[in-house]
Amino acid sequence: MSRAYLAFTAKGEALAHRLAEALPGSVSRCGGDRTLKGWTAEHFAQDEALIFVGAVGIAVRAIAPHCRSKAADPAVVVVDEGGNFAVPLLSGCLLY
């Protein structure tokens, strides 16, 4: 399964790297040349799971333009920066 992690802060990026050790995937952080809109468009089309580390509202607004169908969309999960909570947003039920 191809996974991609996106963090919004340094703290979130550190957590994304720890998560990627257990569930391998690419890790990115918004900022500089890496925009939220660009990252989401790229990874929504190519990966089977997107894991955002940060606020649910940011993730929802980022994925909204790309959502097509339950069968076609990747799984999308948001993890809080503290690593305490994970909120599944899309399609996880169809992967298993």
Model-derived regions: residue spans:
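Short glycine/serine/threonine-rich phosphate/pyrophosphate-binding segments
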Residues: G12-L15, I58-A62
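Conserved small/polar residues in nucleotide/adenosyl-binding loops
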Residues: Y96
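Short Gly/Thr/Asp-enriched flexible loops that form oxyanion-binding sites at enzyme active sites
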Residues: R61-A72
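N-terminal basic/disordered segments at the start of proteins
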Residues: M1-G31
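Short, acidic/small-residue loops that bind anionic groups at enzyme active sites
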Residues: A71-G92
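Short, structured active-site "lid" loops
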Residues: W39-V60
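General beta-strand structural signal in soluble alpha/beta enzymes
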Residues: V27-G32, I51-G54, V78-V79
